[in-house]
Every structure is written in C-alpha cells, then in structure tokens.
Amino acid sequence: DQVDKESQKRRPTNVTKVARAVKPRAANGIDQVVFYHEGVGTSGPLDSFTGGAFGSGIEANVRDLYRFIVYNYEPGDELYMFGFSRGAFTVRTLAGFMALVGLLEKDDDYYVPEIYACYESGDKPGSPAWLKAFHNIEGTRPCPPIRFLGVWDTVGSLGAPGMLGQIFNGKKYAYHDVEL
C-alpha cells in the first residue's frame, strides 16, 4: 500500500480495507494469513520525497514480501496480492520475481538480496551472475499460485515489472477498467 498525502493518511486506502476485511479463518475452516505493508514513502517527509520521486525503498519491500511468503507458504495455499500506486508496482514486481525464481527454501533466505539483484539487473537465468547467485542453493519450490492480483493506479513511470506474462498464461479472468 502507499499513500503520500498527509490528509489521506488518516483515511484507509482500498488495500487497507481489503486487508482489514479478511477474517483469520475462512467459512470453510481454512486459515487465512494477511501481511499488510504500508509501502514506500510512508514513514516521514524524507521517505515520502525519495519514495515518491524515485521509488526508493521498493526493492527492500519486494524482498521483505518475498521472505514473508518463503516463511509462510505451504503447498495448497493461494496468494491474493493487492497494491495501490507504488504498492501496485511492488506486488507486480514481486509476482514477476516469483515467476522467474520460484520460492527459496527457508534456509536459503540469506541469498534473497543477491538473487533479487540479478533479477533487477535484467540478467537472464543461466548467466554467470545467476549461476553465482544460485551456486549454494540446491533448488527452489515452484512459484505459488497467485489467485488474484488486484492493483489500483500502478505507477507506470517506474517501468513494467518483468516476467508478468509468465504468471498469467493460465489466467481464468482478466479485467481492466480505464474509465472512471
């Protein structure tokens, strides 16, 4: 999530409302885990400026979210990701990263920064940088199913996150509303 105007900080965003609406246990008895992250530009005036002007902090947020999934995902789980503005860019980037890398084992989380740097650099899997990053990793788990990716006002000036096409090859539904 991301809000950069002082007056809007007091009002919950759509992402906040969705996070608050999720019950800890679904009607069918399945546990539901919510991880809410306020996003870049929310911890003070300097953070607001650097996050707003340059997207500063997005990489760290992607890595934090990825680690949360590494530690909490169990086979059979489904992921629902939501984001607003730079938060939308963040969850789209996270989805692309997971599509390319899969999920590391918990014991390999130490390598997340190095692997993410390879992803961010645009190097292709199999390149020397990727081989070095994965040198001590025996393998990864497949990318978890992303059941829903809900984004509002994605920040386009930061570029399009890579690998999004691979995530949604088997999509059931896709909606895009450009009119308000």
Task: Show which residues each predicted segment covers.
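Alpha-helical segment proximal to the catalytic Tyr-Lys
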Residues: D1-L180
